């Protein structure tokens, strides 16, 4: 009883215990200097924040890895990490994610990345491919610019065995300074800085330390970031004493780092738990902090500098913070190339340049029905196709970005999102021509379909009607009609404009999900009965007033062409098209009555896999394309038991893009402009994540 009473009195003295816990950010510091700055940070924020605002508690640990473990174990909440450690933090069992990113440059031109460079003294006579036997200066073991990037690039040049990695690096260079390395096991890594001190107290730790190692004549090359040069060499005369090593084995002046760098590296980020991570509270705290104590703010406390040392808690070169989009995990934040380099280092992978890597293509299938078709394709092709599953097109795009899948065919709206995420179009679906050697078709027609029995509806009086869409972010079903409506109504509240609708991919509580039938209600895949072209048309037949589809949809589902009970008795003449001038026309006159021309669906992949995907699909369509006479007895790429699985069913063949191998070239300027205008209405969390580093 006394213990309970004592606890209650303690809580009363400190304020409500639950409230303190919920509004407290426990910041992790890795040395005494960081702990001192953290205490100043805590006290300074207390002066400017309201009583119910976020509070800071400082937690000191011996290293960043200990901080990562502490956050995962709910013993701390946040720490700022180099990109290499962001990757480490994101791995199981830690499962942390970036929640706030530092940005550099200026408010007018902010950058959430920096360049990793190899800095040498002018007059030293060697190139990047001649580093063996030289002396090297690194920022720290496992850090991005100082270790992961350069060692990843040099990995296949290291002497075998390459494990342990530190031993191979020690044998490659004649001497090194690698802070945080184990000097007892790998003494050569600490030859230039005895002890390999692992904190900013040490003279050769971090960016400035690696530069000092080079400047003092200890090393021949320093692996740093471009800002390190300008921070430590303010005058051009001083900078002219140094050069950069380029990937093409040339040298350039240090001012030309954009053309001569080892890699583009994402900025340092604050990480938190993926679940119950307090990311909103952390952002509230840091956003207030940059307002009161950021760059160009007067006061005793400075967020991005410290009298105690360099780069404490945050990088001194940071200008401010951006909130990281919620969809962004560590892999999306770091990017495929960076993650691949780090993964190769971890797993000891060194590709054989003579080996044919194009053995199979892993296709991303949406939902149960697509996976069944993909599995059949995989068996039929003898394993040339492998299958990966995801619930939404965006989840598939993310899997392709991360290397968990290689390819899928997408509507133009998703091609736009995939392009913003770094993927490229590889082949286009052709719907009219079977001549697969010609250039791809110009596109198909996006139309608005209504029932003939409902004669009062026209393009100009759709407000208050019930709408049917293929899915949010798809071309004919969303981007084109909603883009046209946006230009007229000048707002994004489409769920208020239409009385009810089914637009798969909308928020579940939206009126644009009220007409959807499931079984996974409003899901952007075939588990929603009203998903896709046929689904949107069925929605019109059974519940809606207008359907936004492609011009062929009505023809493909009337006159007995679709034997399903809801469609078997439908006639083409039961439906009409809405024209933009307010008139209506028969569905056969789509060429004179449509909303816009839409780009054909296209197969997308990563740049590094594009050539393989293209060759495999062109080979496979020879055997399983429209040359197959009877799809009931043999697998057909362009035929589905339900509609439009993996590819559109009306695909005649896949065609080469003839140079239109970027999403901008493939989609065309007009379509890009239309989608860009609609972006302010976008609910795509993946698009938000993929455009984050394009500030």
Curated annotation (Swiss-Prot):
* Positions with a binding annotation for Fe(3+) 1: 82, 114, 207, 268
- What are the disulphide bonds in this sequence? 28-67, 38-58, 137-213, 156-350, 177-193, 180-196, 190-198, 246-260, 358-612, 364-396, 374-387, 421-690, 436-653, 468-539, 492-681, 502-516, 513-522, 579-593, 631-636
List modified residues, type Dimethylated arginine. Answer: 42
Q: Which residues are glycosylated?
A: 509
Output the Gene Ontology cellular-component terms.
Answer: early endosome; extracellular space; plasma membrane; recycling endosome
Q: Which UniProt keywords apply?
A: Disulfide bond, Glycoprotein, Ion transport, Iron, Iron transport, Metal-binding, Methylation, Phosphoprotein, Repeat, Secreted, Signal, Transport
Binding sites annotated in the UniProt record for hydrogencarbonate 2: 470, 474, 476-477
State the Gene Ontology BP annotations.
antibacterial humoral response; intracellular iron ion homeostasis; iron ion transport
Residue ranges of domain Transferrin-like in the record: 25-347, 361-680
Q: Which family does it belong to?
A: Belongs to the transferrin family.
Q: What is this protein called?
A: Serotransferrin
Whose protein is this, by species?
Answer: Oryctolagus cuniculus (Rabbit)
Upper lineage? Eukaryota, Metazoa, Chordata, Craniata, Vertebrata
- Gene name for this UniProt entry: TF
């Amino acid at each position: 009883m006394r213990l309970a009473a004592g606890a209650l009195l303690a809580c009363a003295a400190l304020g409500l215990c639950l409230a303190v816990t919920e509004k407290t950010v426990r910041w992790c510091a890795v040395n005494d200097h960081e702990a001192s700055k953290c205490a100043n940070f805590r006290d300074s924020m207390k002066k400017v924040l309201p009583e119910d605002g976020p509070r800071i508690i400082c937690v000191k640990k011996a290293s960043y890895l200990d901080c990562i473990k502490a956050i995962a174990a709910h013993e701390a909440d946040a720490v700022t990490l180099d990109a290499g450690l962001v990757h480490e933090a994101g791995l199981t069992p830690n499962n942390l994610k970036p929640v706030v990113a530092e940005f550099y440059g200026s408010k007018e031109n902010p950058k959430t990345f920096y360049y990793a460079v190899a800095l040498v003294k002018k007059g030293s006579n060697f190139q990047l491919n001649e580093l063996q036997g030289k002396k090297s200066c690194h920022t720290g073991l496992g850090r991005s610019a100082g270790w992961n990037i350069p060692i990843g690039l040099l990995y296949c040049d290291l002497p075998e065995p390459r494990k342990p990695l530190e031993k191979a690096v020690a044998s490659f260079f004649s001497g090194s300074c690698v802070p945080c390395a184990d000097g007892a096991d790998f003494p050569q890594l600490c030859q230039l800085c005895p002890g390999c001190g692992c904190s900013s107290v040490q003279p050769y730790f971090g960016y400035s330390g690696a530069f000092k190692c080079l400047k003092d004549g200890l090393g021949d090359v320093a692996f740093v970031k471009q800002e390190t040069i300008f921070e430590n060499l303010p005058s051009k005369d001083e900078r002219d004493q140094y050069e950069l090593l380029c990937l093409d084995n040339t040298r350039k002046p240090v001012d030309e780092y954009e053309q001569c760098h080892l890699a583009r590296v994402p900025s340092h980020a604050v990480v938190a738990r993926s679940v119950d991570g307090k990311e909103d509270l952390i952002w509230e705290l840091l956003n207030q902090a940059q307002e009161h104590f950021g760059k160009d703010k007067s006061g005793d406390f400075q967020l991005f500098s410290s009298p105690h040392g360099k780069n404490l808690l945050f990088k001194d070169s940071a200008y401010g913070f951006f909130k990281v989009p919620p969809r962004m995990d560590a892999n999306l934040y770091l990017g495929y190339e960076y993650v691949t380099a780090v993964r190769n280092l971890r797993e000891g992978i060194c590709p054989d340049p003579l080996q044919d890597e194009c053995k199979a293509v892993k296709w991303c299938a949406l939902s149960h029905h697509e996976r069944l078709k993909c599995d059949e394709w995989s068996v039929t092709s003898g394993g040339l196709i492998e299958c990966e599953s995801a619930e939404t097109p965006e989840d598939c795009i993310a899997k392709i970005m991360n290397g968990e899948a290689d390819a899928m065919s997408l509507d133009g709206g998703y091609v736009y999102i995939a392009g913003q995420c770094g993927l490229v179009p590889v082949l286009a679906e052709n719907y009219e021509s079977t001549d697969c050697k010609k250039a791809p078709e110009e596109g198909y027609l996006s139309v608005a379909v209504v029932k003939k029995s409902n004669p009062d509806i026209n393009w100009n009086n759709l407000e208050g009607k019930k709408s049917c869409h293929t899915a949010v972010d798809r071309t004919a079903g969303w981007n084109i009609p909603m883009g046209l409506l946006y230009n007229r109504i000048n707002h994004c509240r489409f769920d208020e404009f239409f009385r009810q609708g089914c637009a798969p991919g909308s928020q579940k509580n939206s009126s644009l999900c009220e007409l959807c039938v499931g079984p996974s209600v409003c899901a952007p895949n075939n588990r929603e009965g009203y998903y896709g072209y046929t689904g949107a048309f069925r929605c019109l037949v059974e519940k809606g007033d207008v359907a936004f589809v492609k011009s062929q949809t009505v023809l493909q589902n009337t006159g007995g062409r679709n034997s399903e009970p809801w469609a078997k008795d439908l006639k083409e003449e039961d439906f009409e098209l809405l024209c933009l001038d307010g008139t209506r026309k028969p569905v056969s006159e789509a060429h004179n009555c449509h909303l816009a021309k839409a780009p054909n669906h296209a197969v997308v992949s990563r740049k590094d896999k594009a050539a393989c995907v293209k060759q495999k699909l062109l080979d496979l369509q020879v055997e399983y394309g429209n040359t197959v006479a009877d799809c009931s007895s043999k697998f057909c790429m362009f035929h589905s038991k339900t509609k439009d699985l993996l590819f559109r069913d009306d695909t005649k063949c896949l065609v080469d893009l003839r140079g239109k191998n970027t999403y901008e070239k493939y989609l065309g300027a007009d379509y890009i402009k239309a989608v860009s205008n609609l972006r302010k209405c976008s609910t795509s969390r993946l698009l938000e994540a993929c455009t984050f580093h394009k500030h």
